[in-house]
Amino acid sequence: MIYKDSEDIVKSTLKRPVKHGDIVTVGQLSLEVFHTPGHYPDSVCYLLDDILFTGDTLFVGRTGRTVSSGSDTRQLYHSVYNIILDLPGNIIIYPGHDYGPKMTISIDENISLSPLLQAEDVDDFIHQMAKYENERTFEN
């Protein structure tokens, strides 16, 4: 599954364009699609019951980074604060890969762990992201 705006650049005949709000059925499972740009313009998350597969949008302890071509910190703020953090706090996130102290975490627990999820507004988030990048080491 790929976000609909990336359909022309994905070189495969095995693709299914999706958009925000779509329900994708895989066998007996139904996943809701959330378009969550910021890390990349075509980033998506998938909600399955009380599990959110966040890809590179949200990790345990932090958000995705916005240092690549096409990344946008303001878009990431909107995706995280107006989409993901609006979900029930007991939702468990499953990131695309492991960068945190554990593999999965609830939204509420992640908020308490990460300054990036405690920003007062978009400007504070941008400041927190810049601070994270400036203090970043190979380990984090």
Where are these regions (language model features)?
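A generic local structural motif
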Residues: 11, 18-20, 39-40, 78-82
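Active-site HxH/HxHxD metal-binding segment of metal-dependent hydrolases
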Residues: 1-32, 112, 116
